[in-house]
A protein has these predicted regions:
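Short, surface-exposed secondary-structure edge patches
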Residues: 1-3, 21
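Compact nucleic-acid interaction/catalytic patches
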Residues: 20-24, 29-63
Length: 112
């Protein structure tokens, strides 16, 4: 059982390739509770504070402060599968209307 849900913005611990250190970055949980059942992984979309350009699949978060983010941010079209133990904590939740917009961007990116 996970302590996070679809639409949650979480802090993820990414280990450097040389395994000499790690950095924490935010991500948006996009997988469902059903997906999480019996798995040790979750699917998330990366979040960046580099808002200088929007690429296909990117969505600029309007309620970034309310979501617990420190800076204006973009949910990117970069989707990753990570182990549950990489999630360092929950920062907040993306409002339903914005999650719907992200879903539309993912559909566009993945031709779903």
């Amino acid at each position: 059982m996970t302590s996070f849900s679809r639409g949650d913005i979480v802090l993820v611990k990414f280990v450097f390739a040389d395994e000499e250190g790690a950095k924490q970055r935010p991500g948006l949980i996009v997988s469902t509770a059903r997906y999480h059942q019996g798995r040790r992984e979750t699917i998330l979309a990366a979040i960046t504070s580099n808002v200088g350009r929007l690429l296909v699949g990117d969505y600029k978060i309007k309620a970034w402060r309310e979501c617990g983010l420190l800076y204006p941010s973009i949910v990117t079209g970069i989707v990753r599968t990570i182990k549950h133990d990489m999630v360092a904590g929950r920062m907040g939740e993306l409002p339903a209307s914005e999650l719907h917009a992200v879903e539309n961007k993912l559909r566009e990116s993945l031709a779903l």
